[in-house]
Amino acid sequence: MPNVSEYHRDVVLVWEHSTQWKSEMNHSSDFWDALASHHSAIENNYLDLPSLRRIIHDIHQPVLVVGAGQGLIVEALQKKGLHAEGVDLSAEMIRYAQKRRGLTLVRADARAIPFRDGAYETIIYATGVVDFIADDAQIQMILNEARRIVTQSGRIFVAFYRISASMEDLLIRLGLLRNNVMAFKEVLGLYGMNLVQTIAWAAGKADAGYLHATGLLLRSWAFSTTKEKLTALSMQRIFRKVADADSLINAAPEGQPYRNEGEIRNLFTRLATPISKLEATASCYIVEI
């Protein structure tokens, strides 16, 4: 792992010796492992490059990206001349980061990052980490770990995925977003349906006729963001190409949290963690704590 050892030669990979949460880590990474070979088509999403530009002047090296995926953000920071490293839960994502970008990322759980105290000036939690966790106690563990490995004057950024108001409204109407939890597995299954199947499915979920269901879908599509449209089309192509779509769906969690700005503020209030700044971009919220 040259990217890490060149800058921090005292790294100790304690996670290799912890069987309890290593087992949990393997289970949690199943979906990302299954998605890895298709991820290049959708990776510039949520905490994307335009969103990164919103905070770029507040980022100081060395930087650690947690949930680095296949290295999109790490590479972008390095191109800006910053010393940036990354960790991720998924072994397959890490393998593709090496294959596609020549990056050596470290496999680690965000709750126990294998670096010394005060090793970084900036910690960035990409989307797919904190925002995918429902349990406040687990999030608190992650934030405590960030405080440990960042310098006293350092900065911590936490990204939360964002959907458009029209998409949020559609998911609520179809019963796919309730009590701030998205029925992720069910949403994922929609990408494998053709248009007729989707309309029939929506009519059943909304307890409405086909014409009304068609109107709901068209209205949502019309007011969705360009990024949402492109992501949906990319996901449909992935499901047409994948050999076993069911395995990808089965690897996904049943549900995942969705937090709008108000819910994000409520989360940090419960955690007794003051928000220094909250940036709302087209595709994500970025919280500085």
Residue positions per predicted region:
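Class I SAM-dependent methyltransferase SAM/SAH-binding core
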Residues: Q70-A112
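Short, glycine-/aromatic-enriched active-site segment of Class I SAM-dependent methyltransferases
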Residues: G128, L171-L176, L233-P257
